Amino acid sequence: MTFDAIDQMAVSTIRSLSIEAIQAANSGHPGLPMGAAPMAYVLWNHVMNVNPKTSRNWTNRDRFVLSAGHGSALLYSLLHLSGYDVSMDDLKNFRQWGSKTPGHPEVDHTDGVEATSGPLGQGIANAVGMAMAEAHLAAKFNKPGFDIVDHYTYALHGDGCLMEGVSQEAASLAGHLKLGKLVLLYDSNDISLDGPTSMAFTEDVKAKFEAYGWQHILVKDGNDLEAIAKAIEEAKAETDKPSIIEVKTIIGYGAEGQGTSAVHGAPIGQDGIDHAKGVYGYDAPAFTVPDEVARRFEAGIKFRGEAAENAWQTKFAEYEAAYPELAAEYKVAFANEPVHVDLNAHELGSAVASRVSSQQAIQQISEQVPSFWGGSADLSASNNTMVKAESDFQADNYAGRNIWFGVREFAMAAAMNGIALHGGTRVYGGTFFVFSNYLLPAVRMAALQNLPVTYVMTHDSVAVGEDGPTHEPIEQLASVRSMPNLNVIRPADGNETNAAWKRALAETERPTMLVLTRQNLPVLDGTAENAEAGVNKGAYIISEAKGDLDGIIIATGSEVKLALDTQAALEAEGVHVRVVSMPSQNLFDEQDAAYKEEVLPAAVTKRLAIEAGTSFGWGKYVGLAGKTLTIDTWGASAPGDRIFKEYGFTVENASQLYKSL
C-alpha cells in the first residue's frame, strides 16, 4: 500500500477540521485528533469495509469503536469526509445543544457511530464483545463458499484506556478466546491529562499483551502512513490472536505545546491553529475540504464500502437460495424486534428459588430463541445461567452459547454492550447482586445506549446468610433503581420470574436487571394467572382486603410472602389490608394515573413497605404517614432465616409495625 501527497493532505484536513471544530466550541480535546489522525485515516480510507450510504444497516460491515471518546472531533471529521450524515455545519456546531456532534460519541445520535464512548477503557471491552459476536455468528451461519459473517472490529484507544481495569479484564478474555478479528490501535503518546505517563504508567505493554495471548505490533513513527498500513495488514493476517498495534504518536502534533499535557483537553486558540497548519503545510480555509481530498475519500472508503456491500448482498441472495431457513433466522436475529416466548407456569404448592425458576426459564428460552446466549462471571453454578443442552463458547467452538466470562464482572457487562451493539443475538450475564457495583459503569452505558441486555443478579438480600455482610446486598436495589432507562425487576415467585424474563425479552431499547433469590420461594396464589400483567405494570394487587380497606402493605421479591402472612394475621384481628406486589418500581412509575390510583389509592395513607434492603426510595410509595420494614445497616454472618428474624422480618413485627401507623 503506497501513499502520496494527497493522502498527507487528507491527514492535514482531518487534523484541521478537528481543531477548528474544537475552537468553534471553545471546548474539546485537540491532542488526540492531532496525534492520531494518520492512523485513523489509513484505517478508514484504506482498510475498513463500511458503506456510509447504508451506515449501520449493513450487518457485515467492519466495526470501529473510539474508546478514547474524548477525541470525538477526530471521529466526526472522519464521518463527514467519509460521506455519513455529518455535515460541515454539524462540525461547526460541535458540543452545542441539539447538535449531531456531542462532546463524546453517541450511538443512534450521530450517523456512523457504532458505540457511545467516553468512560475510558469501556470501548476496548465493547470491541471485545463485538468480536465475540462476530465469531459466534460466523460459526453459526457461515457455510462453505458463503462467509456471510466475515468482518473485523477495530478500536482506537490511548494510554488512559489501558490504565483502566476494565480494559485489562477484557484483553485477558479476548486473548483466551483468540479473537483474531479484533485489532486495537493504540495511540501511544506517553501523555495523560495530568502529565507524562511516567508519573503513573510505566509497565511493559508489549510483554503484558503478549502474556494475554495477543500479537503486539510497534509502529515507531505515528506519521508514517506506510508503516501504519503494513501493521494493520500484519494484524489482519494473524487469525489466532487479537492484535494491538502500538503507534508512537506526538500528542497535539503541530501545536506549539505538542508532546505535553497542555494540548490534551483545551482549545489551542486561533494562533495555535494557524501555527499547526503552518507545520502541516496546509492552507485550506477553515471548515473546508480540498477537492483532491474529497475525491480521495470518494475513491477510498465510499467506493470500497459500496462495492463490498453490493458483493455481500449478491452473495447473501445466493445463500438465501441455498439455505433459506438459516437466511431467515439471520434476518430475524438482526431485526431487534421484541422476542416472545412461552414458559411453563409454576404450580401452587411448589417452592423454588427465583434463581432456579430463572434457570428453568433460560433453558426454555434457549430452545425457542436461537439467538439467545450468555453466561456468568464465574458463578454459573450459583447464578444458574448455563444452558444444559448447549456447548461452551470457546476458541475451538465459537458456535457455543454458554459464555464463560471469568471473574470479570465489569468486562462482562461492557462486552455484553458490545455484543448487543453488534446485533444478531440477545445476550445475558450473571453474578451475585452484591457485585453489581463492579459492573454499574457498564450498566449505565447500556441504559444510555438503549441496549436490550439482561442481567441475572442472584443472592439478592441478607438471606444469603453465612457468607456475611460482604456478600449481602443492602443499598444495591436503591442504586440500580435510580438509573434512568433500566428495568429492575425483583420477582416474588416462579411465575413472576417467568413474567420478568418475558418482559426482558420484549424490550428492544433498554436493559433489564433481574434480582433473584438464593432461598426457595413458594408459588403464590394467583400469580399463574396475574403475574405477567402485574409485572408488566410494575405492581399489582396480589391479595385484596377481605373487608373495608384499612391500609396497604407493599412488598417485593421474597418479602411478598411475608406480606401475605402478615395480611392473614391482621385479618384474624379484624384489620383488613391489601397486599401489593411491586416487582418493578420503574415499570409502575410508567403507568397512567388511573392505574396507580387503582393500586395505591391516594386516600389510603396507612401503608407499610416490606423489603430486605435499604429504605431509600420507598418514601414516594408509603408517604409521610407510612412506614417501612427495611434494612438500613449491614448484614451479618448466620443462617439466612436467623438473620431475617433478627432484623425483624417476622409476621409479629410486621403486624406491630402496621398497627402502629
Model feature map: region roles:
Residues 4, 21-30, 59-67, 109-121, ...:
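A short glycine/serine-rich beta->alpha loop
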Residues 18, 29, 39, 75, ...:
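Buried hydrophobic positions in well-ordered alpha/beta secondary-structure cores of metabolic enzymes
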Residues 11-27, 187-189:
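N-terminal capping segment at the start of a domain
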Residues 310, 314-452, 530-541, 547-548, ...:
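Non-catalytic terminal/interface segments that mediate subunit docking, oligomerization
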Residues 96-108, 132, 136-150, 167-288, ...:
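Thiamine diphosphate
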Residues 36-177, 386-387, 419, 527:
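Cofactor-binding active-site loop characterized by glycine-rich and histidine/acidic residues
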Residues 59-60, 243-338, 586:
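Terminal amphipathic helices with adjacent charged low-complexity linkers/tails
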Residues 25, 62-63, 113-116, 146-164, ...:
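A short, small-residue-rich loop immediately preceding and capping a beta-strand
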